[in-house]
Amino acid sequence: MGATRVVLAGGRGHGHWHLDNLRRLSARGLVRLAGVCDVTPLEPAALTRLGRPAQGPDLGALIDATGATAAIVCTPIHTHTALALTAAAHGADILLEKPPAPSLGEFRRLTRGLAGRGRACQIGFQSLGSHALRAVRELVADGAVGEVHGIGAAGNWVREEHYFRRAAWSGRRRLDGTDVVDGVLTNPLAHAVATALHLAGSTAEEDVEEVRTELYRAHEIESDDTSCVDIRTARGTRIVVAATLCAARAAEPYVVVHGSRGRITFWYKQDRVLLQRAGHGPDERAYGRTDLLENLLAHRADGTPLLVPPAATGAFMRVVEAVRTAEDPQPVPPSRWRTAAGERSHRRVVDGIDELVDAAAEKLATFAELGAPWAAPLRPAARR
């Protein structure tokens, strides 16, 4: 079988990561970059060791002209559904960046459209390709930490002010009347939410019973940059995910499984797992991961199951929908944040947020429940 012809939609921003991955897979003879779809052509330097792919702004026309049979969609959130369905209509299987859609309605339109075309689609939650997930699930199933009381997740990241000016849709909940929902939990730290749901065994829409949100912003943006969600699954598991882009120091995000006899911490970007339990010393191990584009190629070649088909992100989309339909994020009072120098622009640091985010994951409590002086009670619940 020859190299799969691939078209990349969106070659800038996170698209650079995909270009690097395509270089790696191209060197192995697995893919050939046939085209790049972007409003402005990429410079030759960005395409080093990728040949001279066709370039143009029309994804469907580019797929037809190049004979591509796979497409990577790495474009603004509010364009995901339309472009993925365009790729499917022109005969390509798709690797679609997260979040798959800005609303539950658009997500359902996406899944219906893909089913009607019979095309495969992988959602780009790279953490769900980690081999550590199976290890954690097996530890839980074997009773290593006793009865699971709940799952927490924490993300302390730093983003400077220029991050929210990188594109017209950055930091927006809506753009020209169209949902975008570019919030901390729905985009940059979406992996924390998706990974926690996966470890809870709750991946489908119907697996989520209730979602409550606390959305805040320190920056002058529409969307949230400091938030938490309290999720109740249909199984009764409580999941609390807290995240900020206004941390004093950037830290590796993690998910922690709390049990009656111990805990399991999973740093999902590092594929690293720490088991801590009574009567035993700490046991830390690192695992490999399967690249999601490689998994899509294997699915096309021999039917290998997709690791992250759209159906496996339905629960995550319930969280996106809860964030979308919540009241607009509340501003953190200026007295509760400070400005700090960044590498390219200034950034805002919420007082004590690093410790607060970690405490939310540790205690399975929201910012308001932890007594944050700027936090308000949880927003009305979004139920199924």
Place the predicted regions along the sequence by residue.
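Conserved acidic residues
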Residues: A34, P53, T69
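Predominantly a Rossmann-like dinucleotide-binding segment in NAD(P)-dependent oxidoreductases
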Residues: R119, L128-V211, H219
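Short, conserved SAM-binding/catalytic segment
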Residues: A45-R52, R109-L114
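N-terminal Rossmann-like dinucleotide-binding module
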Residues: M1-L50
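Glycine- and charged-residue-rich phosphate/anionic-cofactor binding loop of Rossmann-like
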Residues: V31-L33, D302-T313
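Short acidic-hydrophobic, aromatic-tinged amphipathic segments that line or gate anion-handling sites
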Residues: A54-D58
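Beta-strand-loop-alpha-helix segment that lines the small-molecule cofactor/substrate pocket
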Residues: A70, P76-I77, T81-L128
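Contiguous beta-strand/loop segments that form the cofactor/metal-binding neighborhood of enzyme cores
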Residues: N187-R272, G279-L306, V320-R324, W337-R384
